[in-house]
Curated annotation (Swiss-Prot):
Protein name (Swiss-Prot/TrEMBL): Trans-2-enoyl-CoA reductase [NADH]
Taxonomic path: Bacteria, Pseudomonadati, Spirochaetota, Spirochaetia, Brachyspirales
Active site per database record: Y237
Superkingdom to which the source organism belongs: Bacteria
Subunit structure comment from the entry: Monomer.
UniProt keywords, alphabetically: Fatty acid biosynthesis, Fatty acid metabolism, Lipid biosynthesis, Lipid metabolism, NAD, Oxidoreductase
GO biological process annotation, one example: fatty acid biosynthetic process
Its job: Involved in the fatty acid synthesis (FAS II). Catalyzes the reduction of a carbon-carbon double bond in an enoyl moiety that is covalently linked to a coenzyme A (CoA).
Residues reported in the UniProt entry to bind substrate: Y227
Organism expressing this protein natively: Brachyspira hyodysenteriae (strain ATCC 49526 / WA1)
E.C. numbers: 1.3.1.44
Length: 392
């Protein structure tokens, strides 16, 4: 069929297989163009590896470190009437490129929150890694719901402010119209549910399961991802329900770091990454507008990075730099260091404060935001004829 972007409420519900493959190839080519990262990492497990920072992690690990990668993701294949999810095509594309380049990989389509999935991954890992242990574990799940198997309760994450109603400005990144944004405050159930889905509980369950199965190598590194952001997004992000979940994730990192040091001389870290376009960030009120302004400022300063540049830098400058892993006072790796640089944030804030509907296009690079968003779904890629039928 001919596949075109179909967007409802700023959510793209179609994906183009050839375009997704092209985007994966672009990321692979970026890593190939960089120096190899010196490390002893041979085996990596990436939980949530089909898009965004998880996919970029996998590509950087496979092509930057030359490691075997096992991926866990919860994606859907195509049906007669609809395309597969972007992550499904990303997984397929990565495997095809890896095979061509002689890099071993395995994709598992599982709900990572389930105990049965953890058991399945442990069983598969023992075979796939040929009895060797995992040197690097990446936890990059971004799911809206999680089932608590012990109670049968289904928890849903929400993006809400805490304490008072949020009123602010946002943008429709497709039409480039400024919007007034209003979000009612969270109740206790909203907070609890969001922490349950997006906090550190499941990360700890995975780490403990792998340690108990004796699958984590001596000196193994374990990384989960977080975000802090600027003052202007704090009410709806870092000081809201999502922020409570990130606080829990970061507290869990301290616990896991201690446990891994004691058991395998390993380490667990949270890496605080920069704001990028993801399927999630595109629907967070205020965030697309902030990202559009940030992109403009960082591009002008030669500091702009997407997911793949960030993940290569994580490996090359932070985790495997030949010395100590640089962390802040809370033991977090800071890949948002360029985003939160004083000169960058000052320019972003100045632009934010003088924003009007008339100067929006000058101040915010929404064209780049839109391109990144479309690329994630396999659209707007160079060299692809979107008028042609494609096998979905």
């Amino acid at each position: 069929m001919v596949v075109e972007p179909k967007i409802l409420n700023n959510i793209c519900i179609t994906a183009h297989p050839l375009g997704c493959a092209k985007e994966v190839e672009n990321h692979i080519n970026y890593v190939k163009s960089q120096p190899k990262v010196k490390s002893n990492v041979k085996n990596a497990l990436i939980l949530g590896a089909s898009g965004g920072y998880g996919l970029a992690s996998r590509i950087a690990i496979a092509y930057g470190l030359g490691a075997k990668t096992m991926s866990v993701s919860f994606e859907k294949g195509a049906t007669a009437r609809r395309t597969a999810t972007p992550g499904w095509y990303n997984n397929e594309a990565f495997s095809a490129f890896a095979k061509k380049d002689g890099i071993e990989d395995k994709n598992l389509i599982l709900d990572a929150f389930l105990n049965a999935s953890k058991e399945e991954v442990i069983k598969e890992a023992k075979t796939f890694f040929n009895g060797e242990k995992i040197d690097l574990l990446i936890y990059s799940l971004a799911a809206p719901v999680r089932m608590d198997e012990s109670t049968g309760t289904l928890y849903r994450s929400s993006l809400k402010p805490i304490g008072k109603k949020y009123n602010g400005i946002g943008v429709d990144f497709l039409t480039e119209e400024l919007l007034e944004v209003s979000i009612d405050p969270a109740n206790e159930d909203d907070i609890k549910s969001t922490v349950k889905v997006m906090g550190g509980e499941d990360w700890k369950l995975w780490t403990d399961a792998l340690l108990n199965a004796d699958l984590l190598a001596e000196n193994a590194i374990n990384v989960a991802y977080s975000y802090i952001g600027p003052e202007m997004t704090k009410a709806v992000y870092r000081e809201g329900t999502i922020g409570k979940a990130k606080d829990h994730l970061e507290a869990t990192a301290h616990e896991l770091d201690k446990e891994m040091q004691e058991k395998i001389k390993g380490h667990a870290y949270v890496s605080v990454n920069k704001a990028v376009v993801t399927r999630s960030s595109a629907v967070i009120p205020t965030v697309p507008l902030y990202i559009g302004i940030l992109f403009k400022v960082m591009k002008n300063k030669g500091l702009h990075e997407g997911c793949i540049e960030q993940m290569y830098r994580l490996l090359n400058e932070k985790l495997y730099n030949g010395g100590e892993v640089p962390v802040d006072s809370d033991n977090r790796i800071r890949l948002d260091d360029w985003e939160l640089r004083e000169d960058v944030q000052k320019e972003v804030l100045d632009s934010w404060n003088k924003l009007t509907k008339d100067n929006l296009k000058e101040i915010a690079d929404l064209a780049l935001f839109r391109k990144d968003y479309m690329n994630m779904h396999g659209f707007d890629e160079e060299g692809i004829d979107y008028s042609q039928d494609v096998q979905i």
